[in-house]
Each structure stands twice: as structure tokens, then as C-alpha cells.
């Protein structure tokens, strides 16, 4: 059973309720990625690291028992990847020519989800911040490689 257009539409609405505010005042596509991560950091901070990604939490709990739910979760994650990939595609001239923006987008989402999970587990932003700092360093290195400048 495939996801209906209505389900895909609802997944887009959820994405846009987080993305639109995050990207409102940021025009640089790579900085949009980090603005999204900053929104999640703020949500964690404001909740003393109790808030997490509700879709990520649901995905951990409902991995196999319900294929229809799993499919909706996949639509949601695919939507996140697609939006981040769009940012990275817009910055293609600042990334190495062989950069796979789909894989990079998956890496960004995994960094966010893993950082959120660790922050909630340890009730501290330390792991989340370390993940984002490492991701920032990686993007800086990619951009330096693309331009031939020193890292």
C-alpha cells in the first residue's frame, strides 16, 4: 500500500513548519543546513534536553510491526533528506565536483538524529554540539577542497 498524496502533503507541512522559520533570515544554502540544526539545538536547550525528534523516536519504536507506519516514517525522512539535498545542490559550486549531495544530506540528517538522541540520553547538549561542530568542520574541508584553499 503506497502513501497517499494526503500523507505526503502532511509530511511536507511538518517539514515546512520547522524549515520555514529556520530559513527565514538565512539565504546561504550551507548556512540553511546549520540553521536547521540550530533550531533543533534550541528545542533541546529549551526543554532541558527532553525534546527530541518525534519522528525519530517513533521510528525507533515502530521499526517492523506496522509497514504502513514505517512507510510514512520513510516519507518523512525522505522529505528531510530532499530539503537538505536541495540546499547542498544550491551550493554545488562550493563543494567538490564529485560530492554526492544525496549522501551528504543523509549524513546531515543522521548527524542531527544521532546528536538529538545522545543529548536526550545524557541530558546535555555536549554530544549534539560536538556532532554539529564536526559536521561544520567537514563542510569547511569540503569547501576548501573545492576551491583548492588550505584547510
Give the location of each predicted region.
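Structural signal for well-ordered, non-membrane alpha-helices
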Residues: 12-16, 20, 41, 81-85, ...
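Amphipathic alpha-helical segments used for helix-helix packing
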Residues: 32, 47-68
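All-alpha amphipathic helical-bundle segments outside canonical DNA-binding/catalytic cores
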Residues: 31, 71-75, 92-107, 123-126, ...
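An amphipathic alpha-helix adjacent to DNA-recognition modules
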Residues: 1-24, 34, 74, 81
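Hydrophobic alpha-helical segments that form the core
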Residues: 56, 98-118, 134-138
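Hydrophobic alpha-helical connector segments
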Residues: 19-51, 101-108
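Amphipathic C-terminal alpha-helical segment
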Residues: 43-46, 109-126, 138-147
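Hydrophobic alpha-helical bundle segments that form small-molecule/ligand-binding pockets
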Residues: 25-26, 65-67, 78-104, 139-151
Amino acid at each position: 500500500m503506497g502513501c497517499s498524496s494526503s500523507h505526503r502533503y502532511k509530511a511536507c507541512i511538518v517539514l515546512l513548519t520547522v524549515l520555514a522559520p529556520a530559513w527565514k533570515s538565512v539565504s546561504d544554502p550551507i548556512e540553511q543546513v546549520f540553521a536547521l540544526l540550530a533550531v533543533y539545538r534550541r528545542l533541546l536547550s529549551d526543554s532541558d534536553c527532553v525534546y527530541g525528534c518525534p519522528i525519530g523516536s517513533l521510528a525507533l519504536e515502530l521499526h517492523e510491526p506496522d509497514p504502513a507506519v514505517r512507510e510514512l516514517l520513510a516519507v518523512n525522512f525522505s522529505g528531510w533528506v530532499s530539503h537538505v539535498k536541495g540546499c547542498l545542490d544550491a551550493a554545488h559550486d562550493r563543494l567538490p565536483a564529485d560530492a554526492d549531495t544525496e549522501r551528504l544530506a543523509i549524513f546531515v540528517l543522521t548527524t542531527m538524529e544521532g546528536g538529538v538522541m545522545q543529548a536526550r540520553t545524557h541530558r546535555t547538549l555536549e554530544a549534539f554540539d560536538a556532532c554539529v561542530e564536526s559536521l561544520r568542520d567537514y563542510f569547511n574541508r569540503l569547501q576548501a577542497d573545492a576551491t583548492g584553499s588550505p584547510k
